[in-house]
């Protein structure tokens, strides 16, 4: 199994190019199931989750593959097997996104209950509620969601809770339904808007994009399109925090600062100087950093996917701070690993309090989920001495060539085989 070996204490500086957003690419890949013909998607990161979903599409009968470094082609003309099997999707919760498209185009779907990060309950009840509201019969049997519908019908419905993948699944199902669907309490995340724009490029009729109420007028069929996904705001934030903890100065290119304003504001509160451009963000860190308290919430508030990275920052910042996690339970599994590195950190319920220390010490640590792995990389960059991070397959699920990008900024980091 592979590990990352990091020698801390190196200042990060230079420029780095941001990859396409995993959380935008995955639903758009699922949406290609709605179309007969070949759809081409640009700015696709080469990630484990992306490869898994391509394998799922191919298993169904599609022809899905990379045609260039960051370009994917999907021809879903001849889907013969509308099933997402457990063997393929057990590592990825986004697999449930094929439910809506399969049901809309083929009238049936069988999707294994999703796996992915071990960060508490991520229920699919809102997905099931949405499909039933559109007229589908849905059962959960032996670990699979099985759905059937002769024809989906437009409906007005309200999500009980804000859910990104739930919104996306209902959106994809509704575009081919009879009549108009009005979806209230829809997620506002930029990745949801990106999917909606892609669907409209395929011929869908979606209004209210970027608001909490989406109106979808069903159409008879969609057509292929050529679409470029938005940049990864979480990768952008992660690399900016990595630069901050090393007292660094970097420019993140091909990104969109308006997508992560809540993160940039917290970096400024920590003492960093931030410059925003149309397609770049520049950060210059001023030490000592100041600890920042924050509370995760749906977009446009502070994203849960940046919580762990800021916890690493707070561990080496001046003062104490509290981080409150409101989105997912059990998303503090990186705390014991930070403690191994010398962090002063305490959990009470859904709140973590940190008391900054002068320096962390390198240690062998283990990643437990995608963002926890990023947190440990950041902590290792700030630490004194060598850190070896195990289970970095979590990192590879969501970050494209992370060690290559960090090495380009001056980090001493290498991928090694576990002894």
Curated annotation (Swiss-Prot):
Phosphoenolpyruvate binds at residues 22-23. Gene3D superfamilies: Enolpyruvate transferase domain (3.65.10.10). It comes from the Bacteria. It catalyses: phosphoenolpyruvate + UDP-N-acetyl-alpha-D-glucosamine = UDP-N-acetyl-3-O-(1-carboxyvinyl)-alpha-D-glucosamine + phosphate. UDP-N-acetyl-alpha-D-glucosamine binds at residues 93, 122-126, 305, 327. InterPro entries: Enolpyruvate_Tfrase_dom, Enolpyruvate_Tfrase_sf, MurA_subfamily, RNA3'P_cycl/enolpyr_Trfase_a/b, UDP_GlcNAc_COvinyl_MurA. Keywords: Cell cycle, Cell division, Cell shape, Cell wall biogenesis/degradation, Cytoplasm, Peptidoglycan synthesis, Pyruvate, Transferase. The keyword Signal does not apply. GO terms for biological process: cell division; cell wall organization; peptidoglycan biosynthetic process; regulation of cell shape; UDP-N-acetylgalactosamine biosynthetic process. It is an enzyme of class 2 (transferase). It holds the Pfam family EPSP_synthase. Disulfide bonds: none annotated. The modification 2-(S-cysteinyl)pyruvic acid O-phosphothioketal is found at residue 117. It is found in: Cytoplasm. The active site is at residue 117. GO terms for cellular component: cytoplasm. SUPFAM superfamilies: EPT/RTPC-like. HAMAP family: MurA. Belongs to the EPSP synthase family. MurA subfamily. This is UDP-N-acetylglucosamine 1-carboxyvinyltransferase.
């Amino acid at each position: 199994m592979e590990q990352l070996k990091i020698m801390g204490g190196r200042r990060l500086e230079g420029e780095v190019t941001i990859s396409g957003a995993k959380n935008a690419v995955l639903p758009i890949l699922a949406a290609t199931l709605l179309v007969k013909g070949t759809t081409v998607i640009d700015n696709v990161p080469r990630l484990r989750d992306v490869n898994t979903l391509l394998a799922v599409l191919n298993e169904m009968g599609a022809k899905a593959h990379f045609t260039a470094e960051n370009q994917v082609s999907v021809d879903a003309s001849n889907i013969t097997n509308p099933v997402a099997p457990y063997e393929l999707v057990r590592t990825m919760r986004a697999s449930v996104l094929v439910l809506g498209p399969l049901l809309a185009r083929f009238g049936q779907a069988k999707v294994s209950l999703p796996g992915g990060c071990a960060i508490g309950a991520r229920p699919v009840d809102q997905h099931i509620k949405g499909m039933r509201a559109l007229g589908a019969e849905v059962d959960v049997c032996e670990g699979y969601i099985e759905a059937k519908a002769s024809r989906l019908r437009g409906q007005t419905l309200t999500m009980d809770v804000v859910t990104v993948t739930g919104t996306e699944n209902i959106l994809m199902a509704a575009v081919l339904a009879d009549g108009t669907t009005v979806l209230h309490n829809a997620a506002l995340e930029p990745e949801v808007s990106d999917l909606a724009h892609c669907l409209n490029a395929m011929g869908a009729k979606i209004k209210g994009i970027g608001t909490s109420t989406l109106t979808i007028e069903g159409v008879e069929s969609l057509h292929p399109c050529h679409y470029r996904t938005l940049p990864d705001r979480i990768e952008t934030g992660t690399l900016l925090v990595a630069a901050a903890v090393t007292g660094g100065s970097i420019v993140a290119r091909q990104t969109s600062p308006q997508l992560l304003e809540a993160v940039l504001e917290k970096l400024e509160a920590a003492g960093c100087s931030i410059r925003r451009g149309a397609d770049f963000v520049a950060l210059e860190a001023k030490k000592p950093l100041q600890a920042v308290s924050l509370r995760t919430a749906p977009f446009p508030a502070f994203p849960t996917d940046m919580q762990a990275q800021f916890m690493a920052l707070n561990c080496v910042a001046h003062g104490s701070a509290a981080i409150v996690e409101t989105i997912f339970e059990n998303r503090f599994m990186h705390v014991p690993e930070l403690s191994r590195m010398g962090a002063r950190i305490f959990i009470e319920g859904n709140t973590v309090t940190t008391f900054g220390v002068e320096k962390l010490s390198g240690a062998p640590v283990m990643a437990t989920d995608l963002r926890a792995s990023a947190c440990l990389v950041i902590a290792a960059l700030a630490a004194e001495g060598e850190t070896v991070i195990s289970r970095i397959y979590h990192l590879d699920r969501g970050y494209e060539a992370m060690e290559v990008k960090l090495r380009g900024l001056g980090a001493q980091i290498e991928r090694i085989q576990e002894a």
